[in-house]
């Protein structure tokens, strides 16, 4: 039986979050064993924040949750791709549909930002 290898990166694995219809990569985050299990059991994406050192469910503040459609692992079983239905307009905390809106062009990184919501309004603390 295949077991996910959480040891290579100190207990974490990269999780690539992809739109289940378009294939667009929405975000990349990290999971530990607990958050992967929470994701598999709840059908919503859960992650471990390295910055805040805590567990979080995608959309817990913004309402932009992700419904799990399919989960795959790679040949080394040390990362996962999670295909989701994005509930709400955006996956990125910046208000963009995807976290990948900065493109290498002409020798520099160029931002192609098109926020679908105002983060200052959504993340009031």
Swiss-Prot record:
Co-factor binding details: Binds 1 Mg(2+) ion per subunit.
GO cellular component: cytoplasm
Residues noted as binding Mg(2+) in the record, renumbered to the chain: 74, 76, 78
Ligand binding (Zn(2+)): 75, 92, 99
Main enzyme class: hydrolase
GO molecular function annotations of the record: magnesium ion binding; phosphoribosyl-AMP cyclohydrolase activity; zinc ion binding
Pathway as given in its UniProt record: Amino-acid biosynthesis; L-histidine biosynthesis; L-histidine from 5-phospho-alpha-D-ribose 1-diphosphate: step 3/9
Cofactors required: Mg(2+); Zn(2+)
Subcellular location: Cytoplasm
GO BP, sorted A to Z: L-histidine biosynthetic process
Keywords: Amino-acid biosynthesis, Cytoplasm, Histidine biosynthesis, Hydrolase, Magnesium, Metal-binding, Zinc
Reactions mediated catalytically: 1-(5-phospho-beta-D-ribosyl)-5'-AMP + H2O = 1-(5-phospho-beta-D-ribosyl)-5-[(5-phospho-beta-D-ribosylamino)methylideneamino]imidazole-4-carboxamide
EC number of the protein: 3.5.4.19
Record InterPro entries: PRA-CH, PRib_AMP_CycHydrolase_dom, PRib_AMP_CycHydrolase_sf
Gene3D superfamilies with a match to the protein in the record: Phosphoribosyl-AMP cyclohydrolase
Similarity annotation: Belongs to the PRA-CH family.
HAMAP family recorded: HisI
Function: Catalyzes the hydrolysis of the adenine ring of phosphoribosyl-AMP.
Name recorded for this polypeptide: Phosphoribosyl-AMP cyclohydrolase
Native organism: Geobacter metallireducens (strain ATCC 53774 / DSM 7210 / GS-15)
Name of encoding gene: hisI
